[in-house]
């Protein structure tokens, strides 16, 4: 009798785990298939506004005229933990350049958690802690980190996700190319107006 009981338990447990596996697989497939970017290279930055950790405002409008790098993150995300030091290195490289703006925006993570992580990891990137996905979902539906590089006019020129995450050399090259492209457009505009040209 006991052996019959064990056999039945094994049978039903097998069915349970098979069904559980199917359920998990379908959830993963749904997440992957549903996960896409709402904005892509060539699109304009969506209209958003957030408060930074120093109390100042960051918005689409405030980024106009600057080459911008934005990262969406969560401090418990392993890929974000790898990407944030890269963004920190980039931030330190361009901190003195007023033409470049680099910011981090959390996805569903509050001020206390983000501030604690920043302090423990010696990060100085300006950030905005967002308790929800309201701002994040203007850019994407799933997946972090998300890194966007934008021109002075708000056009997104490159986007990186977690597969693979962006490297410092890639981001630095993107920023330099975008700075040079913006300067080229500025020169073209000045020439078309027959005004003295100054390359920034």
Residue ranges: model-predicted function:
Residues 98-112, 123-132:
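Thiol-based oxidoreductase modules, predominantly thioredoxin-like and allied folds used
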Residues 149-200:
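Thiol-/selenol-based redox modules, centered on thioredoxin-like
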Residues 30-60, 191-195, 199:
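N-terminal "domain-start" segment that seeds a small globular fold
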Residues 72-89:
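Conserved redox-active cysteine motifs that mediate thiol-disulfide chemistry
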Residues 115-153:
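Short, internal strand/loop/helix patches
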Residues 66-68, 73-76, 143:
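Short pre-active-site segment immediately N-terminal to redox-active cysteine/selenocysteine motifs
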Residues 69-70, 102, 147:
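Hydrophobic beta-strand anchors of alpha/beta hydrolase catalytic cores
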Residues 23-26:
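C-terminal motif of bacterial Sec signal peptides marking the signal peptidase cleavage site
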């Amino acid at each position: 009798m006991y052996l019959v009981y064990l056999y039945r338990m094994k049978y039903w447990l097998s069915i349970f785990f098979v069904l559980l596996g199917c359920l998990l697989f379908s959830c993963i497939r749904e997440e992957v298939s549903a996960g896409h970017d709402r904005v892509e290279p060539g699109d304009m930055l969506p209209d958003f506004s957030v408060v930074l950790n120093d109390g100042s405002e960051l918005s689409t409008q405030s980024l106009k005229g600057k080459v911008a790098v934005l990262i969406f993150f969560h401090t418990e995300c392993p890929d974000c933990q790898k990407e944030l030091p890269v963004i920190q290195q980039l931030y330190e490289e361009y901190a003195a350049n007023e033409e470049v703006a680099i910011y981090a925006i959390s996805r569903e993570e509050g001020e206390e958690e983000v501030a604690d992580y920043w302090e423990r990891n010696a990060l100085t990137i300006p950030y905005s802690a967002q308790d929800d996905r309201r701002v994040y979902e203007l850019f994407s539906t799933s997946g972090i980190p998300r890194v966007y590089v934008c021109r002075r006019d708000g056009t997104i020129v490159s986007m990186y996700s977690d597969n693979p995450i962006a490297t410092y050399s890639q981001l630095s090259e993107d920023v330099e190319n975008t700075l040079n492209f913006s300067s080229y457009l500025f020169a073209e505009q000045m020439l078309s107006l027959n005004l003295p040209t100054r390359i920034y």
